[in-house]
Structure formats: structure tokens, C-alpha cells
Amino acid sequence: MDLTEGSALGVFSCQLCEVSSPYSFYGQKPPNTRAIVLLEECFGIKDPFSPEREKFLILGSKCSLCSKTVCVGTVRRSCDSQSEAKL
């Protein structure tokens, strides 16, 4: 994976499924984009499957309910398991 533009800031690691990947940006504004502002701060990388500079992939974010670092698609499972533990 070529991360020469905006080289890796660190390694994103999901606290639920343990998937990990280097990330090249964190925040609401992906680099090399003009009119894109994300609703939440998230970890992302330049899309390794696209030659276009503006394309990016979201890896995950901090869950707004439990504050765990989770990958895309696991937030509901994270919060459901936490609320089940409280019952």
C-alpha cells in the first residue's frame, strides 16, 4: 500500500474484531478533497484501489456511546453488547 501522500500517522486497530491497518488521516476533512466534510471524526486512508487522489476509505471511528475505537459496521454490536451487560 502506497502511503507516500500523507504517510501513515499510526495504526488503526478495532477494539472489537482486532482488524488493523495503517491510517493516513484522522478527522472530519479527508486530505485532497474539496467539498467533503464528514459528520464525525474518523480514521481513513487513501483508497488503494483507485488512482484518483480524492478517493478515500473510512476505516472506523470512536464510538459516540462507548468511546471504543471500532471499524465501520461494528458500532451497533459494540453498543448492544455494552447495554446487555448493564441489564
Curated annotation (Swiss-Prot):
It comes from the Eukaryota. It holds the Pfam family C6_DPF. Signal peptide: none annotated. Belongs to the CDPF1 family. This is Cysteine-rich DPF motif domain-containing protein 1. It comes from Danio rerio. The lineage of its organism: Eukaryota, Metazoa, Chordata, Craniata, Vertebrata. The gene is cdpf1.
